[in-house]
Amino acid sequence: MSQEPEPGAMPYSPADDPSPLDLSLGSTSRRKKRKSHDIPNSPSKHPFPDGLSEEEKQKLERRRKRNRDAARRRRRKQTDYVDKLHEACEELQRANEHLRKEIRDLRTECTSLRVQLACHEPVCPMAVPLTVTLGLLTTPHDPVPEPPICTPPPPSPDEPNAPHCSGSQPPICTPPPPDTEELCAQLCSTPPPPISTPHIIYAPGPSPLQPPICTPAPPDAEELCAQLCSTPPPPICTPHSLFCPPQPPSPEGIFPALCPVTEPCTPPSPGTVYAQLCPVGQVPLFTPSPPHPAPEPERLYARLTEDPEQDSLYSGQIYTQFPSDTQSTVWWFPGDGRP
């Protein structure tokens, strides 16, 4: 016995599924719309047809209830799925808005950096010329020419805190001329001239390209000069013991205060150092030569003439006689005002 569906029954159909318009609506409106369907044991809107027995009416009621429960479960699942999609869409919209804001900030920063780059390119010392770029494209095997090294100009004394390179003007390239480099190389490779005089060490004159070279004296000469200068000077009438032997005392014991001998007994030889002429605390820059053997020393004589009538000195005679010379030097000292 085939059973036909009752006209009052509401079987499940695809029309019960939410439409795209319902999916676009909020979850609140959808929940309000389905409240009437979610009420359990709600009375049927369609009455039973006439001519049915009680058993058939119970079967029809059970079928309607199953259909309503199945439709309710289906709508609930679909609603939960749509709610999840709606929450994911809202989260994606928030992330999209955040990304759009970040993109706007990056575009603003990119525009600012492009403006700074356009202002810096004309004065940048590291910029590669266009000819070098074209040469690299045409001849890839040639070596890359290095850009010139720019030396910023030194700051003037009026502006000690002035920067070397300003943003408005490029640095000035000042390579040294080739003639100056060659001249400096020749001057540096040339050895210093030999020292011909043992007395004074001469240094070359000042040059605009090379500072004067100061050659220190040998350490032995410095030590010897320091020792000679530290020695106290001898008396005026006695020459230095290094160059003249000690003089024998005068037999008459003439006046030491009137002795006119203030110079050494022998003429100075080249390189001779006299302690009398060396000031204390100053070391001369020359090398002394060894003392020469002195010849036989000259002799100093004195002769006094006294007046037999008076006990006073009438005249005195002091003379010096050299062994190799017969001439002598005589000094007269009159006494008592007599002619």
From Swiss-Prot:
Source taxon at top rank: Viruses
Keyword entries, A-Z: DNA-binding, G1/S host cell cycle checkpoint dysregulation by virus, Host nucleus, Host-virus interaction, Modulation of host cell apoptosis by virus, Modulation of host cell cycle by virus, Phosphoprotein, Transcription, Transcription regulation
Residues covered by region (Basic motif): 57-84
Coiled-coil blocks: none
Leucine-zipper, as annotated region: 85-113
PTM note: Phosphorylated by host CDK2; this phosphorylation greatly reduces the DNA binding activity of MEQ.
Family: Belongs to the bZIP family. Jun subfamily.
Record's protein name: Oncoprotein MEQ
